[in-house]
Amino acid sequence: MKNNLNYLKNNLNLCGYTLLRVTNNKILIFKSFYKYTKCIYVSYFDTSIEVKIDKVFDTEVYPEYIERLMITKKCFDSIYDSLWYIQRSILI
């Protein structure tokens, strides 16, 4: 489990994003923009990797709108597929 998260950490091109290890089986990748923060949550389970992508909006800029928009949630069986998906999400 720890080796898979280390593999992701070592092989991701973060492009200005920040990577934090939250627990032994979870990492958070985020970057703040003017109106929102893009967050990518990666959780490793026994047989799968779950990737969630959120946009968290600044409520001072948009006080009448939603605070959080969950864009996608995907589960992967392969570390390589999850790496490709996370890297693509960072670049978009």
Locate the predicted segments by residue:
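C-terminal basic regulatory modules in eukaryotic proteins
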Residues: 45-92
